[in-house]
């Protein structure tokens, strides 16, 4: 699919990492949101970094970005390739040793993060990059595409943790959310870190988690 030239927008992001399910979900709105997000990235000249699968929401968002002419980088553990890669793949697929290396590589090559609806794996990836932001390992924005209120319960939990003193109010600001791709990417573009960092210039960035900011 070709996006009309007049709709192209300038973005400060080169690549955005999208976390999402290897399932499509029961509602068509989840699938529509994945395609809409892919189209929104294309309209802003943003490339995609994702988990490398060709099934579920992963397959839909990657296909939309690829069809729009933007570059796609899929990062997938070797052990998951038989399960999550079916048929023809799109873009560049990089095989890594394990789930930990997958997350580190996805973060390294991205300027921002977006979570579509997903399950345990999506939540685990999302919470890790939020934690890295809280620790000062990166200051990249993290967004929830809250399709049909999918993440309302998670946001309520986080607000409860702030209320009970387990998450600081400034750390709560790490996460932004919106119901549509257009609104969410706009919020990510406008994001300015305001949380206090627990550590800066962590010497264990590469040694401990295998993550380093890409120039």
Curated annotation (Swiss-Prot):
Keywords, in A-Z order: Cytokinin biosynthesis, Cytoplasm, Hydrolase, Nucleus
Subcellular location: Cytoplasm; Nucleus
Reactions the enzyme catalyzes: N(6)-(dimethylallyl)adenosine 5'-phosphate + H2O = N(6)-dimethylallyladenine + D-ribose 5-phosphate; 9-ribosyl-trans-zeatin 5'-phosphate + H2O = trans-zeatin + D-ribose 5-phosphate
Tissue specificity as recorded in UniProt: Expressed in roots and shoots. Detected in root procambium, lateral root primordia, vascular tissues of immature leaves, axillary buds, style and ovular funiculus.
Protein residues bound to substrate: 84, 102-103, 119-125, 131
Disruption phenotype: No visible phenotype under normal growth conditions; due to the redundancy with other LOG proteins.
GO CC field: cytosol; nucleus
InterPro entries referenced in this protein's UniProt entry, alphabetically: LOG, LOG_fam
Main location: cytoplasm
Pfam families the UniProt entry points to: Lysine_decarbox (PF03641)
EC code(s) of this entry: 3.2.2.n1
Biological process terms in GO annotation: cytokinin biosynthetic process
Molecular function GO labels: cytokinin riboside 5'-monophosphate phosphoribohydrolase activity
Enzyme class (EC, first level): hydrolase
Activity vs pH: Optimum pH is 6.5.
General function of this protein: Cytokinin-activating enzyme working in the direct activation pathway. Phosphoribohydrolase that converts inactive cytokinin nucleotides to the biologically active free-base forms.
Entry similarity comment: Belongs to the LOG family.
Protein name from the UniProt record: Cytokinin riboside 5'-monophosphate phosphoribohydrolase LOG3
Source species: Arabidopsis thaliana
Gene: LOG3
